[in-house]
From Swiss-Prot:
Protein name: Ribosome maturation factor RimM
Pfam families attached to this UniProt entry: PRC, RimM
Kinase listed as a keyword: no
Organism superkingdom: Bacteria
One GO BP: rRNA processing
Organism: Streptococcus agalactiae serotype V (strain ATCC BAA-611 / 2603 V/R)
Family: Belongs to the RimM family.
Subcellular location: Cytoplasm
Cystine bridges: none
Classification via InterPro entries: PRC-brl_dom (IPR027275), PRC_barrel-like_sf (IPR011033), RimM (IPR011961), RimM_N (IPR002676), RimM_N_sf (IPR036976), Transl_B-barrel_sf (IPR009000)
Subunit structure: Binds ribosomal protein uS19.
Amino acid sequence: MEYFNVGKIVNTQGLQGEMRVLSVTDFVEERFKKGQVLALFDEKNQFVMDIEIASHRKQKNFDIIKFKGMYHINDIEKYKGFTLKVAEDQLSDLKDGEFYYHEIIGLDVYEGEELIGKIKEILQPGANDVWVVERHGKRDLLLPYIPPVVLEVDLSNQRVQVELMEGLDDED
């Protein structure tokens, strides 16, 4: 079974078994709702166990969660640095034009018939996602995921069609 990252445990929160999680999902309320089961992976990306969410709340840039059956800091301190993942069969269906990051990363990027590079990472700096395109012999291209730039995402052919706006590629 394949798993996908939804957050990283960065620290404990108080003494009552809560953890600070840096979320990497667009579905926070769904992923961290009470009763949701997530997989816990260690720093070496090895499966540790399935855990059930007992509670969730937001605090600043973090999601504060508590696992069922772990109600003291001593129960959870060992999980700092671990990753929370969701099983593939728990992924939600998306609307047309919406994609999971794992579907986008690795796609070839074309402008017209010219291959620009391959998407290696997705950043979330603010209003829209930014796709990082790895190019041969050039610096990475930061591609905003906005309609005038990203014209088509074709998952079946593993390609993205773009139109680079003036000033977007500083190496031209």
